[in-house]
Amino acid sequence: MDRTLKFVLATLTSNIAFAIYHLLLGLYTSSWWLLTLASYYFVLSIVRYVVLRYKSKEDFIIRFTGWMLILLSVPLVGTVILSVLRDRGHELHMIVMIAMAAYAFTKITFAIIKLIKARRSKSAILVTLRNISLADASVSIFALQRSMLVSFEGMRETEIVIMNAALGSAVCVIAFLLGANLLRNKKYSLTN
């Protein structure tokens, strides 16, 4: 099994675990934010599974992933609306926040580096996987920000709402544009 496949299997497993975690915690706390994130991670898991399952049908994978990233911007818009109107975040212990920050920043750093490297590649599978990773990492940064703004003092309620709306909207646009880019870009080879 090559390194890329092992990495995709690991991220698929973590997406499924995150989806179950957010679903159970969302049901337990009655948090629409967590339930919406659970739906996001379940759909992302399906997309990663389809990429693994149908990797020989690259044209299908590009189109499917492009449309799914565009559709994933819908629950992301829901999370932004929820964070503005109802659920501005949960206060967490400083150690948990440091761990979340380390995880989110590592995730976004690797996603950006791998996306830049994949841009030179003609492999549709590789570019598709990197687009999925960047969308996933962007959501992690948004979730981190939501928790940090309420866990650490210094910002007023209005400022928190503005920050959540701004970054959340940017994450929605990123997911949408990553999907649209896959649909419009025909430069990738149809062989891996």
What is each model feature region?
Residues 96, 114-139, 187-191:
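Membrane-helix boundary/juxtamembrane motif in polytopic membrane proteins
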Residues 1-51:
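N-terminal topogenic module of multi-pass integral membrane proteins
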Residues 38-45, 72-76, 94-113, 168-173:
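Generic alpha-helical transmembrane segments
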Residues 7-12, 63-74, 129-140:
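Select subsegments of transmembrane alpha-helices in polytopic membrane proteins
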Residues 138-192:
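C-terminal transmembrane-bundle signature of multipass membrane proteins
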Residues 36-72:
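Hydrophobic/aromatic-rich structural module bridging two neighboring secondary-structure elements via a short loop
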Residues 104-121, 141-148, 176-180:
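Alpha-helical transmembrane segments in multipass membrane proteins, preferentially the mid-helix core
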Residues 23-35, 80-95, 148-160:
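Helix-coil boundary and interhelical linker segments in multi-pass alpha-helical membrane proteins
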